[in-house]
């Protein structure tokens, strides 16, 4: 199964994760562990998932002073996760410090984790960005600005909406990693994300990775839902 498809393990605890993963016995997935699960279970959940053979995107969106982020990333790299992230709004010094921490903490003989930055959350509308955050750019301009800053700071890519991918390819080049959440099957509810797309649309727009949560985790048959998403994402029959 494709490892450019990331399954969001948005569960409150390990018991729910274990129950969900029973549907995928023998499969090596790329999974996302977010704040709720990591703060509840700690590094033990990472160890458990690695022992099961899964790749891990640890989605903690670090945003602090450079020295603190550097130290935190050093610790996260020692867990042997595959992808981590920060908020681009933390600035270039913070992002450069994140890379330094990952290099220092990576396990011997292994590459450092992929490091990406959040430009704007997928729940952010342009009206919200201007009125509440105080950024007087269009949403597209703000995302492109942060993506360029991210690349200049030495990170591998960004978390962004699928709708922003074509513009970011222009600004940052074809090798720049774009990780796109807010992915839903056409039959699903949008829920709390404003800028959403289907797996097929994400493929057409050129996303590097897609993150899918509820469409798979809340499905009556998670494995079949996973295969449906994979088929739409890769454009092949499974």
From Swiss-Prot:
SUPFAM superfamilies: Ribulose-phoshate binding barrel
PROSITE patterns for this protein: OMPDECASE
Example of a GO cellular component annotation carried by this entry: cytosol
SMART domains membership: OMPdecase
Pathway of action: Pyrimidine metabolism; UMP biosynthesis via de novo pathway; UMP from orotate: step 2/2
UniProt entry keywords in alphabetical sequence: Decarboxylase, Lyase, Pyrimidine biosynthesis
Listed name of the protein: Orotidine 5'-phosphate decarboxylase
Organism: Bacillus anthracis
